[in-house]
Amino acid sequence: MAKKGFGGGMMPGGGNMNNLLKQAQKMQENMQKAQQELESKEVEASVGGGAVTVKVNGKKEVIDITIKPEVVDPDDIEMLQDLVLSAVNQALRNIDDIQASQMSKVTGGMNIPGLF
């Protein structure tokens, strides 16, 4: 009597493996779509009462920095550097938060390492 090889018949549960594969493919498509949408987003962060504003896109590229002329003090460059650094870091945190929220919606709250 010949033995059936692995997978030589219906999976227990009536083909749940096919459904699982379809769900995984759909999730992958949704993640790619969400990633494309995220890359087109732009986020701003302002510090120092609006003295410095930084805009980043979903690719985490700084696309604009606005500095009010009144904060440019040649005798205190360090303060301006701190404001720019703070604004850049805040803008990056903002885009990270948006990305995490968007991916959580796509993955149904599953934490999948390395998505972004």
UniProtKB/Swiss-Prot annotation:
Q: Which Gene3D superfamilies match?
A: Nucleoid-associated protein YbaB-like domain
Q: Where in the cell is it found?
A: Cytoplasm, Nucleoid
Keyword Kinase attributed: no
Q: Which family does it belong to?
A: Belongs to the YbaB/EbfC family.
- The identity of this protein, by name, is Nucleoid-associated protein CD630_00170
Q: Cite the record's note on assembly.
A: Homodimer.
Entry GO MF terms: DNA binding
Keyword list (alphabetical) reads: Cytoplasm, DNA-binding
Role played = Binds to DNA and alters its conformation. May be involved in regulation of gene expression, nucleoid organization and DNA protection.
- What Gene Ontology cellular-component terms does the record carry? bacterial nucleoid; cytosol
Q: Note the Pfam families from the entry.
A: YbaB_DNA_bd
Q: Which organism is this protein's natural source? A: Clostridioides difficile (strain 630) (Peptoclostridium difficile)
Keyword Lipoprotein belongs to the record: no
Using the UniProt record, give the first listed, main subcellular location.
cytoplasm
